[in-house]
Structures are given as C-alpha cells and as structure tokens.
Amino acid sequence: MRIAVDAMGGDYAPLEIVAGAVKWVAEEEERQIFLVGQEELLKQELKSYSYDPSRLIVVNASEVITMEESPATAIRRKKDASIVVASRMVKEKKADAIISCGSTGAQMAAAIFILGRMEGIERPPIVASIPNMTGAYTLLIDVGANVDCKPRQLLQFALLGKTYASIIYGVEQPRVALLNNGEEESKGNTVTMETYALLRQQSGINFTGNVEGRDIFTGKSDVIVCDGFTGNVLLKTMEGMALFIAQGILGAGGPMPAFFQRLDYTQTGGAPLLGINGLSIVCHGSSKREAVYNGLRIAEDCYNKNIIEMQQLELSKISG
C-alpha cells in the first residue's frame, strides 16, 4: 500500500511524523510511504534512521498551510502546500491514501476540491470510533468537519456511518441513532426534529431514535449522528475526561484500566473523511509518533476493506 503523508502538518511536524512513518513502513515490504513536505528539512530528519529509500520517498512541497489561514482560500492559493500535493497524489493514483495531522479545514477543502465528493454527498463528515461498555465500538459522525449542518446532510452522514460500521466492524443492520437532548421525538431544535423525520422515513437505515450523551458508551447504538460542532466538542470532552481520570488513577498508584487506554487518541490514530472519492485520514493535531503510526494503520485497514468502493456502492443503491 502507498500512503502520502503530509509531513508538515501537526504540532510536532516533521519530527514525530517522520518517526511514525519510518516505523510503519519498516514492518511490511509491500508498504510504501511518500513523505510530502519541505525536502531539505525532511532529508535532515531522515538522517537519524536506517530505511529503504525505495519505500520511503521524499516528495518536495515548498509551502505549508497554517491553522490560522482560511482553508478554502489557502488551498487555492498555495498550490505547492504539502496537503495539496499529497491530495493530488491520491487523485492521480500515485498514492492510495493520505494522512495529515494538520489543519482539518485544509484537509477537508483539499478533499472536496481535489479528490471530489461522492454523488449524493454535500459535506464529507469525519467518523470516530468510540469504545463502549460491550467491548465494541460506537461510531460518532460528524466529529469536526462541518459545524453547521442541514437535516439532509445529517441523513447523508447516517448513510455513510452505517456503511462504515458494516464494512470496518462487520455489523449487520447497524443501529443508527440521532444525538439529542432527550429521547422523545419532540425533543431538540428544528434541525434535529427535521432530521428525525428524515431518518425515520429512510428504509435503508435501521433508525432507533434519539439518544442522549450519556448513552454513547452503553453500546445501545452502533452509529450516532450529530453535527460537527457538537461531535467535536463531545470528542474533546471525552479525551479530557479520560486523561483526568487516568491521571487520578495513576496518581493513586493504580493500574490504567483497559477502557481508558482505548479512549486514548494515540491508540485510535486517526479518523477517515467519508463521502469523498479518495481515502483521507484526519489525525489529531497533537499526534506524536505512536499516533501517526496508528493513523497509518487505520488507513491500511480502510484500504484493505475497500472502504471507498463500498461507500460508492451503498450510495448508488440508495440513489437508485
């Protein structure tokens, strides 16, 4: 598998990005990494490692898109930015996937303008796997790509989420729920109430109704749909709470419970953007080498399970 890595994105780029990439590519001979970024800087970092230059290749990209820039404007203006060059490699079939720890907005803009959206998808969402009490995972979608959503877009998220649950986790007839401030159909704002009606009418979705925030860890739902603003705040709150509890346990001299280890974003690695014509994995901005390695692992799993083709097939059934 060939992965284009945005080596300039993230709080610890390029040092930790390079370290994670070197570890991943060394494990299997069929793996290949393209480190996309400022060539001289990346070659300097690579001097610390022994690697096969035919499988770990530096691709020069002279520009970087910062967190402060307008994503859509920067994507158009900075044609040689690392995220743009890496995305073009996927578009041109020179790489099978891209991962980035940089600006999520820039990565989404590159996905839309370079890779393109699947037919019937207006906004690509990010899906996150949340461990639940049953030992399985509950998917939360969207967790940050779209802060404002219309009901029909949330319906599209539900379709993509249930497809992902089936393909990646082998769930038959995934139970899809809508995140709300109460379980009753009448709860919520105009958007959630209209979304509820759309989900209930969609025969291709096993819609089980509204769920509250406390239900996320119970395992009563396989997919939980929400807008990206709510999902991102919720995800970051879970990360912070897990860290708070873990530090308390470790401070008291106790062992770290396995459940809290599963909440650690470094173990999850990354989350895919769904609904685009190419595999794009969004990684945490604070990712270090272990998280980068696991992000590459997620990309490989999605690629091996043909996640792009399976999404397109499922969407064609719905539209048909």
Swiss-Prot record:
EC number: 2.3.1.274
Entry keyword set: Cytoplasm, Lipid biosynthesis, Lipid metabolism, Phospholipid biosynthesis, Phospholipid metabolism, Transferase
GO BP term, pick one: phospholipid biosynthetic process
Top enzyme class: transferase
Cystine crosslinks: none
Cellular localization per UniProt: Cytoplasm
Functional pathway: Lipid metabolism; phospholipid metabolism
Primary site of residence: cytoplasm
Subunit structure: Homodimer. Probably interacts with PlsY.
Described purpose of this protein according to its UniProt entry: Catalyzes the reversible formation of acyl-phosphate (acyl-PO(4)) from acyl-[acyl-carrier-protein] (acyl-ACP). This enzyme utilizes acyl-ACP as fatty acyl donor, but not acyl-CoA.
Name recorded for this polypeptide: Phosphate acyltransferase
Gene from which the chain derives: plsX
